[in-house]
A protein has these predicted regions:
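Gly/Gly-Pro-rich "capping" loops immediately C-terminal to redox-active cysteine motifs
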Residues: 182-215, 230
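Short pre-active-site segment immediately N-terminal to redox-active cysteine/selenocysteine motifs
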Residues: 50, 165, 173-179, 184, ...
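Solvent-exposed, acidic/flexible segments
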Residues: 40-48, 61, 162, 166, ...
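Electrostatic cytochrome c docking/interface patches
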Residues: 147-172
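Axial heme c-ligation environment in periplasmic c-type cytochrome domains
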Residues: 190-196, 216-251, 255-259
């Protein structure tokens, strides 16, 4: 006799919610995501709860960050201000819940890993707030409430440089690269290598190789098991990539920060 399967459970702060419990809540909606990044841009329909409604039960301070942990070790860090938006003219965050009796399709790029479920953070009107692909974490297991990133991971932040390009690059790093990489051995995820120790990418990938690598990693090097996605123009403009490179270049001078 096969062992009984455990029902998927989502942790939100100190609380836990079973999938069946969430699917019965009065706030549940049927939503349509017109261009779903987890499914190759196809249109998908989900049973989902507005993040602002579910997280209203969790005490959040204005400067708190929600770290979204996924089954494969990916961790997206999303600010309270961003994930709790509820007004018109803004992107709206939803937690999509997979019904165990009506499974979603397998992920097209990772069919062996199953679907995007059991829980998936999706957005309606993502273009209104510039939502990036890394802010669509799937196979979510927990939403962890954290304080300010600067307090949690001070070595990620330049100590002296206030150049506007570096500041913009840091913000993009927080929303994208930080989901997989650490900086000076600080960060919530270790899916990818540290981006400063022992070497910073700017020290071994020179122009134009580094911007090209960020845009399309497989155009520089490719191997079985490589996980890093490319960042197309719809995610990163050429200027965005230049800003991220400026931040990385600055951090190459701040390795002593990790001592």
């Amino acid at each position: 006799v096969a062992p009984a399967q455990t029902e998927p459970t989502l942790k939100v702060g100190v609380k836990s919610y079973a999938a069946s419990e969430l699917l019965k809540r009065p706030e549940i909606e049927t939503i349509t995501v017109k261009h779903d990044p987890a499914y190759g841009g196809r249109e998908m329909r989900y049973q989902a709860i507005r993040a602002a409604a579910l997280f209203a039960e969790t005490k959040l301070r204005d400067d708190d960050v929600m770290q979204v942990r996924c089954r494969d070790g990916f961790v997206a860090s999303i600010s309270k201000e961003r994930i709790m938006r509820a007004g018109p003219g803004q992107s709206l965050a939803y937690i999509a819940i997979e019904n165990p009796k009506a499974k979603w399709p397998d992920l097209p790029l990772k069919p062996s890993s199953g679907s995007a479920g059991p829980f998936y953070l999706v957005w309606l009107n993502p273009e209104l707030s510039g939502i990036l692909q890394e802010e669509w974490p799937y196979q979510v297991v927990a939403f962890e409430v954290k304080g300010r990133l600067r307090d949690l991971y001070p070595r990620v932040f330049p100590r002296h440089q206030q150049d506007a390009r570096v500041v913009r690059g840091l913000k993009l790093f927080e929303r994208t690269c930080f989901a997989c990489h650490t900086m000076n051995h600080e960060g919530p995820s270790q899916v990818g290598p540290d981006l400063n120790l022992p070497l910073n990418p700017t020290e071994y990938l020179k122009e134009p190789a580094l911007p090209r690598y960020i845009r399309d990693p497989k155009s520089i090097r490719s191997w079985e098991g490589s996980k890093m996605p490319g960042f197309g123009p719809e995610t990163f403009s050429d200027e965005d990539i230049a800003d991220v490179v400026a931040y990385l270049r600055e951090m190459a001078f701040e390795k002593s920060h990790a001592d």
